[in-house]
Swiss-Prot record:
Family: Belongs to the SmrB family.
Assembly, per entry: Associates with collided ribosomes, but not with correctly translating polysomes.
GO biological processes: rescue of stalled ribosome
Function recorded in the entry: Acts as a ribosome collision sensor. Detects stalled/collided disomes (pairs of ribosomes where the leading ribosome is stalled and a second ribosome has collided with it) and endonucleolytically cleaves mRNA at the 5' boundary of the stalled ribosome. Stalled/collided disomes form a new interface (primarily via the 30S subunits) that binds SmrB. Cleaved mRNA becomes available for tmRNA ligation, leading to ribosomal subunit dissociation and rescue of stalled ribosomes.
A GO molecular-function annotation: rRNA binding
Keywords recorded for this protein, A-Z: Endonuclease, Hydrolase, Nuclease, RNA-binding, rRNA-binding
Name of protein: Ribosome rescue factor SmrB
Entry's EC annotation: 3.1.-.-
PANTHER family assigned to the protein according to its UniProt record, in alphabetical order: DNA ENDONUCLEASE SMRA-RELATED, UPF0115 PROTEIN YFCN
Limits of the Smr domain: 98-173
Length: 176
């Protein structure tokens, strides 16, 4: 053990002699900005606000007797009646599905806003919204909310293969 210690001390002394006259290098590390993270935060905030804007169209305070005849059928104006007819016959297949089971009205409104924002971003024009049976609260509210949104072209009760009276098929206007 003595030999090992003596070798270590000798090698340490030799190393110090060899490095005699050298000086420490100046730190030349380049620190990169966090621009990528900042851009990600800005994008996520922008997407959040876009989704929130879409959910602000849905109001609880408008007249609720708007759908007296048929609460599961709506067309924005008469130019789109052919779209509604095709939707009733099941000619359109949904590009995206939204399940609102177990959500309260506030959460459902937020999810509807997110759905419309995603559909417009991804250029999907047909959506399927499953509200289920339950206490029929969402079943009564969803057509009312959708009719208030300016980007909804038409909606109708889903065909039997897509959930029948527990779901709604929606046609969304895509902005280019």
């Amino acid at each position: 053990m003595n030999k090992n210690r003596q070798l270590a001390v000798n090698s340490n002394i030799l190393f110090r002699k060899w490095l005699n006259g050298t000086r420490e290098m100046v730190q030349d590390t380049i620190f990169h900005s966090r621009l990528h993270k900042v851009n990600q935060k800005i994008r996520s905030k922008r997407m959040f606000f876009e989704q929130d804007v879409h959910s602000n169209y849905f109001s609880f305070y408008k007249k609720k007797d708007f759908f007296k005849e048929n609460p599961v059928s709506y067309v924005r104006n008469k130019d789109f009646t052919n779209v509604l007819k095709k939707l009733k016959k099941g000619k359109y297949y949904p590009d995206i599905f939204l399940d609102l089971h177990g959500l309260n009205q506030y959460q459902a409104r937020k999810k509807l806003g997110q759905l419309i924002a995603i559909c417009q971003k991804e250029k999907m024009f047909c959506a399927h919204i499953m509200h289920g049976y339950g206490k029929n609260i969402l079943k009564k509210q969803i057509p009312f909310w959708l009719s208030q949104h300016p980007d909804i072209v038409a909606f109708h009760q889903a065909p039997k293969m897509f959930g029948n009276d527990a779901a709604i098929m929606v046609i969304i206007e895509i902005h280019s």
